[in-house]
C-alpha cells in the first residue's frame, strides 16, 4: 500500500513525540533522582547529568519490550487493516493527548503517570475511531490492576528492607561495624539486578541469545566479583573516612562546649532587654543572669544549669536561614525584640516568599488564646522545600512581673515591667510553598517565679509527666548520623542511577511507543508492525526525556524528593532499590507499570514506618486522586484530536 500521501503525518508525529518525551522528562524523571536530591547526596545539576546518561542508556537497552505492549497490547490493531491511515491518525492523536495533559500537570507541579497518559490516550482515539470493540478490555484490566499492585508491592519491599536496615544498622549504638559488613551485600544486590535486567532484556540488541539460567549465573558472578571488590577496597576506605569524620566532629564539639561555657554568664542573644524596659534603666537585666540567680536560690538547682540548658535547647531545636554567633548550626536566636514583646527574625527578601509571608503575618495578626496544654509542648515539623528558605519565626508576647528578692528591696519598690500576670500566647505562622508547608517554629515560654524568670523552650524543660511530643525523638527519625550518612551516601547515588536506568527503559515507551507504531506502519504499509523497534527511535525518545529534565525537571523533583516526606540517605537507598527492582521486573515481563506509583508507594511506606507524621498525607491524597483523573482526561484530549482529524481529513471509521 502506498503511504507517500501520509508522510506529513509521520513528520508531525516526530515533532509531537519529541514534545511528549519532553513532558515525560519534566514530570516522571523526578521519580528517579528526586529522593537523591531531597536527601542532599547529589545536587540538582549532578542529578541532571547522571539522569541524562542513565535515562538514555535504559531507553535503548530496555525500552523495546514495553514499547511493544503499548503499541499492540491495548488495542486490536488488526481491526484497522482496511483503514491504515485511521490508525496512523490515532497514534498522532494519542501523542497529542498525552503530551498536552503531561505539560499541564508539569506546569501545575503535579506528579502524574506517563503510562496512564498514553494508555488513556490510546483508548480515547480507539473509541472514536472504531468504538468499544477496538479496545482489548482484558489487557486494560491487567494494566489497571498493575497500577495498584505496583505501589503496594514496591511499598512492601521498601518497608521490609528499611525495617531490616533499621534493626541491624540504624538503631545500633555503633552502626559502623554492621553497616560495613552489609555494604558488599547491598552493592552486590544492586549490581545483580541491574546486570540481569540488561542481559535479559537487552540481549537481542547486543546480539546475544542466552538461556535464562545462563543470564542468572552471569549476573550472580558479576555481583560476587563486585562484592569482593567492595569488601577488599571500599570497606577499609569507608572505615578510615568515617573515623576521620568522627574525629573532626569530636573536636568541633569540644570547641562548641568551650564556647558555651564562656558565654554562660554573658547576655543571651534571645532577649537583649526585657519588653518595656528602657536602655538606661537598671531593670534591663539579662535574662540568663536572672535565670541563673533564680536557679541559684532554688533548691536542688545549680546556678549555671538553667541558662545553658535553655540556650542549648534553643540552638538544637531551631533551624532556619540565619547564622548564630554562638552555635555551629544553621539557626540561632539572632533576632531583636521590640516594645510589643515579639522577637523578630529576618526572612531573606529574595526567597520568593517575602510577600506571602507578610500576608500570613497579617492574617495571623490576631492572638490565639488557647489553653496551655493545647498551645505548648508542640514543635511543628520542618519540611524542607526546594524553592524557599525554611524560616523560624517566634511570635512570643512576653508578660512578666519581676519581684525583687527580700535582700534587695521591698516588694512595693519592685518595678512592674509589663503586667501583673504571666501569660503566653503563640502565633503559628505558616506559608505555602506550592504543595508543602515549610515550618520550623520554636515555641518559648516566659514565666515568673519567686525571685526571677525562667526561660523554657518548647517542652524541653517542662514537667516530664505532661503528655506531649518529644522533639528529640522526631529529630532522631529525620536525620542519619554522620557515619550512617557516609555509609549510604554513594549507595543512594548508585541506586538512583539504577532507578534512572529502569525509568528510561519503562517510560521511553510512553513517549516513543506511538511513534514507533506510526513509523513501522509507514515503512511496511500495514498494521502488523512485525519489525523490531528501531534503536535510533529509542535514542530519540531518550534525548527528548533528557531535554525535558534539564528545562523543567526541577518543578516536580521538589514534590517527590522533599514535600512528600523527609528523605535521608538510608531511607532514600531503600526507596530507590526496592522501587527500581519492581520497575525492572515489570519491564522485563512487558507490564507497563507506573514508575510514579512504585516510587510513591516506596516513599510513603518508608516514611510511614519512620513516623506516621512524617508523611504529607494531604499531598499523597492529591497524588492518589491524580492517578484516577489522568486516564480519562488524557483520553478526552486524544478523542477530541482524533475526531478533529477524522473530520478534516475525511478518514472513514473502521467500524463501518
From Swiss-Prot:
GO molecular function: phosphate transmembrane transporter activity; sodium:phosphate symporter activity; virus receptor activity
Glycosylation sites: 81
Induction statement: Down-regulated by high phosphate diet.
Classification via InterPro entries: Phos_transporter
Record field: transmembrane: 6-26, 47-67, 87-107, 110-130, 143-163, 191-211, 214-234, 484-504, 532-552, 573-586, 595-610, 623-643
Tissue: Kidney (at protein level). Widely expressed with highest levels in liver, heart and brain.
Catalysed reaction equations from the record: 2 Na(+)(out) + phosphate(out) = 2 Na(+)(in) + phosphate(in)
Keywords: Cell membrane, Glycoprotein, Host-virus interaction, Ion transport, Membrane, Phosphate transport, Phosphoprotein, Receptor, Sodium, Sodium transport, Symport, Transmembrane, Transmembrane helix, Transport
GO cellular component: apical plasma membrane; brush border membrane; plasma membrane
Modification type Phosphoserine: residues: 253, 256, 259, 268, 316, 385
GO biological process: phosphate ion transmembrane transport; positive regulation of bone mineralization
Subcellular location: Cell membrane; Apical cell membrane
Main location class: membrane
Segments in the Cytoplasmic topological domain: 27-46, 108-109, 164-190, 235-483, 553-572, 611-622
Recorded topology in the membrane: Multi-pass membrane protein
Positions on the Extracellular side per record topology: 1-5, 68-86, 131-142, 212-213, 505-531, 587-594, 644-655
Subunit structure, interactors included: Homodimer.
Main function: Sodium-phosphate symporter which preferentially transports the monovalent form of phosphate with a stoichiometry of two sodium ions per phosphate ion. Plays a critical role in the determination of bone quality and strength by providing phosphate for bone mineralization. Required to maintain normal cerebrospinal fluid phosphate levels. Mediates phosphate-induced calcification of vascular smooth muscle cells (VCMCs) and can functionally compensate for loss of SLC20A1 in VCMCs.
Similarity comment: family membership: Belongs to the inorganic phosphate transporter (PiT) (TC 2.A.20) family.
PANTHER family reported for this sequence: PHOSPHATE TRANSPORTER (PTHR11101), SODIUM-DEPENDENT PHOSPHATE TRANSPORTER 2 (PTHR11101:SF83)
Name of the protein in question: Sodium-dependent phosphate transporter 2
Species annotation: Rattus norvegicus
Lineage: Eukaryota, Metazoa, Chordata, Craniata, Vertebrata
Amino acid at each position: 500500500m502506498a503511504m507517500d500521501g501520509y508522510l506529513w503525518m509521520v513528520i508531525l508525529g516526530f515533532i509531537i513525540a519529541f514534545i511528549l518525551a519532553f513532558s515525560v522528562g519534566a514530570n516522571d524523571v523526578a521519580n528517579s533522582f528526586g529522593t537523591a536530591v531531597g536527601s542532599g547526596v547529589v545536587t540538582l545539576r549532578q542529578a541532571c547529568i547522571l539522569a541524562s546518561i542513565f535515562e538514555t542508556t535504559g531507553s535503548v537497552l530496555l525500552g523495546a519490550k514495553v514499547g511493544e505492549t503499548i503499541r499492540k497490547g491495548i488495542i486490536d490493531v488488526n481491526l484497522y487493516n482496511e483503514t491504515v491511515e485511521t490508525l496512523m491518525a490515532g497514534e498522532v492523536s494519542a501523542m497529542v493527548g498525552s503530551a498536552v495533559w503531561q505539560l499541564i500537570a508539569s506546569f501545575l507541579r503535579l506528579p502524574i503517570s506517563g503510562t496512564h497518559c498514553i494508555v488513556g490516550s490510546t483508548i480515547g482515539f480507539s473509541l472514536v475511531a472504531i468504538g468499544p470493540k477496538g479496545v482489548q478490555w482484558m489487557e486494560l484490566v491487567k494494566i489497571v490492576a498493575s497500577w495498584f499492585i505496583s505501589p503496594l508491592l514496591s511499598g512492601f519491599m521498601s518497608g521490609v528492607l528499611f525495617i531490616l536496615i533499621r534493626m541491624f544498622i540504624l538503631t545500633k549504638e555503633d552502626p559502623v561495624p554492621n553497616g560495613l559488613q552489609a555494604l558488599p551485600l547491598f552493592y552486590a544486590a544492586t549490581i545483580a539486578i541491574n546486570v540481569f535486567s540488561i542481559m535479559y532484556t537487552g540481549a537481542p540488541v547486543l546480539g546475544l541469545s542466552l538461556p535464562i539460567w545462563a543470564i542468572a549465573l552471569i549476573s550472580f558472578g558479576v555481583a560476587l566479583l563486585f562484592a569482593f571488590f567492595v569488601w577488599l577496597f571500599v570497606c577499609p576506605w569507608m572505615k578510615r573516612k568515617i573515623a576521620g569524620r568522627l574525629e573532626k566532629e569530636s573536636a568541633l564539639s569540644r570547641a562548641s562546649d568551650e564556647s558555651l561555657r564562656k558565654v554562660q554568664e554573658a547576655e543571651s542573644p534571645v532577649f537583649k532587654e526585657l519588653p518595656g524596659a528602657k536602655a538606661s534603666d537598671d531593670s534591663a537585666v539579662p535574662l540568663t543572669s536572672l535565670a541563673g540567680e533564680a536557679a541559684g536560690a532554688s533548691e536542688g538547682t545549680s546556678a549555671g544549669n538553667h541558662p545553658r540548658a535553655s540556650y542549648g535547647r534553643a540552638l538544637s531545636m531551631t533551624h532556619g536561614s540565619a547564622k548564630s554567633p554562638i552555635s555551629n548550626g544553621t539557626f540561632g536566636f539572632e533576632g531583636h525584640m521590640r516594645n510589643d514583646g515579639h522577637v523578630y527574625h529576618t526572612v531573606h527578601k529574595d526567597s520568593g516568599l517575602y510577600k506571602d509571608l507578610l500576608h500570613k503575618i497579617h492574617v495571623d495578626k490576631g492572638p490565639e488564646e488557647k489553653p496551655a496544654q493545647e498551645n505548648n509542648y508542640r514543635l511543628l515539623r520542618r519540611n524542607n522545600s526546594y524553592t524557599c528558605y525554611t524560616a523560624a519565626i517566634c511570635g512570643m508576647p512576653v508578660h512578666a512581673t519581676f519581684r525583687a528578692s527580700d535582700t534587695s528591696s521591698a516588694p512595693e519598690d519592685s518595678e512592674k515591667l509589663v503586667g501583673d500576670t504571666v501569660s503566653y500566647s503563640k502565633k503559628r505562622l505558616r506559608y505555602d510553598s506550592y504543595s508543602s508547608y515549610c515550618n520550623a517554629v520554636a515555641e518559648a515560654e516566659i514565666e515568673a517565679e519567686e525571685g526571677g524568670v525562667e526561660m523554657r523552650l518548647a517542652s524541653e524543660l517542662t514537667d516530664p509527666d505532661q503528655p506531649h511530643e518529644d522533639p528529640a525523638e522526631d529529630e532522631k527519625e529525620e536525620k542519619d548520623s554522620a557515619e550512617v550518612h557516609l555509609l549510604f551516601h554513594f549507595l543512594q547515588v548508585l541506586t538512583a542511577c539504577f532507578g534512572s536506568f529502569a525509568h528510561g527503559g519503562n517510560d521511553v515507551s510512553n513517549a516513543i511507543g506511538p511513534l514507533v507504531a506510526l513509523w513501522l506502519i509507514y515503512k511496511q504499509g500495514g498494521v502488523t508492525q512485525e519489525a523490531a523497534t528501531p534503536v535510533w527511535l529509542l535514542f530519540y525518545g531518550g534525548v527528548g526525556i533528557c531535554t525535558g529534565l534539564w528545562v523543567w525537571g526541577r518543578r516536580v523533583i521538589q514534590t517527590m524528593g522533599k514535600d512528600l516526606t523527609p528523605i535521608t540517605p538510608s531511607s532514600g537507598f531503600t526507596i530507590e532499590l526496592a522501587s527500581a527492582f519492581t520497575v525492572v521486573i515489570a519491564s522485563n515481563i512487558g507490564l507497563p507499570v507506573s514508575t510514579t506509583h512504585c516510587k510513591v508507594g516506596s516513599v510513603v511506606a518508608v516514611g510511614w514506618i519512620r513516623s506516621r507524621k512524617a508523611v504529607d498525607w494531604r499531598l499523597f491524597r492529591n497524588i492518589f486522586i491524580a492517578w484516577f483523573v489522568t486516564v480519562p482526561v488524557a483520553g478526552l484530549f486524544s478523542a477530541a484530536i482524533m475526531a478533529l482529524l477524522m473530520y478534516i481529513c475525511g478518514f472513514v471509521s473502521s467500524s463501518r
